[in-house]
Each structure stands twice: as C-alpha cells, then as structure tokens.
C-alpha cells in the first residue's frame, strides 16, 4: 500500500470491539467485574441479533452481540464455527464515502454497505492480512436520541456532552 498524507486519510477512530456471545446475560457479569457499565441493549434493525454496548473506563466501548432465538444469521453461523469470541473491530469514520474510496483505491475489499436512519456501515472483508473483520461506521446525530445517557455516547469522534 502507498503512503497517504493526512489530507488523503479520512478522520477515523476505534469505536468499539464486538464480541460474539451466545447470551449477553451470561457474559455480562465478567464485563461488570472488569468495571464496564452497560449503556444500551437493543435489537438490530434486521431482527437477527441483539447488541449491548458497555463503557469501559472513560471512553472505551465493548459490544456484546447475541443471536435472537429461532433466527439463523451470520451470528449463529459464526458461533457454530468459532464459538464465542472476538467478532469485529469497529472504526468510526467521519466520512463513509471517503473512507471506502481510500480503502478501495488501495485494493482493499469493502463489502455490505448499509445505510440506516441513525448510521451507515460497511465492512472490510476478513480476507485481509490481519484476518480481522473491520466494521466502518458513520453515525448520524439521531443515533443518540432515545438512548439512556446519550451524553456518554460519541458522534463524530466527540462526546455528545462536549
């Protein structure tokens, strides 16, 4: 890959690490022992899985994702093949189109772009030298609406209370 200057690289930060579990309720006690505080537990817009976000320390977030009973999905396939464990690393990007363009210009395969009301997401295929599934997310301001403690969420890389 070629070197890029700051002007070519879109603003980006680590948002959270996603961990696949069979049950959030079973996994949550360990996160609580580590000092994590649950911020959100809700169903994915597709209805195939649920996620719970946890704040760890001042700004680090961990996401647990669990399948919805009776639903076959990427998550049930992942758990059947791998068991519980790290599923993805999410990077918040300030400009999804620019981030995808920068990656694809270097031959990186970006897949499954989806635009929701509250965010856009895309994934870097795990068939890359790291073997990691990278999720790119661009949040919209409406992401925080209706969630408990929205001032503790980050949009555009900044805490909403700033």
Label every model-predicted segment:
Residues 2, 7-57:
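Long, hydrophobic N-terminal alpha-helical segment
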Residues 41-44, 74-80, 115-117, 145-148:
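Short, tandemly repeated low-complexity microdomains enriched for cysteine and small residues
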């Amino acid at each position: 890959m070629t070197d890029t200057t700051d002007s070519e690289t879109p603003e980006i930060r680590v948002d959270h690490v996603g961990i696949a579990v069979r049950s959030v309720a079973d996994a949550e006690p360990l996160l609580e022992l580590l000092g994590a505080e649950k911020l959100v537990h809700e169903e994915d817009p597709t209805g195939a899985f649920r996620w719970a976000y946890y704040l760890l320390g001042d700004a680090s977030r961990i996401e647990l994702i669990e399948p919805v009973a009776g639903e076959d999905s990427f998550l049930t396939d992942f758990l059947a093949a791998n068991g519980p464990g790290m599923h993805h690393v999410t990077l918040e990007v300030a400009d999804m189109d620019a981030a995808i363009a920068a990656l694809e210009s270097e031959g990186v395969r970006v897949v499954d772009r989806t635009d929701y009301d509250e965010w856009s997401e895309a994934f870097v295929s795990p068939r890359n030298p790291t073997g990691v599934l990278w999720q790119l997310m661009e949040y919209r301001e409406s992401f925080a609406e209706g969630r408990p403690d929205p001032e503790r969420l980050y949009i555009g890389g900044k805490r909403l209370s700033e």
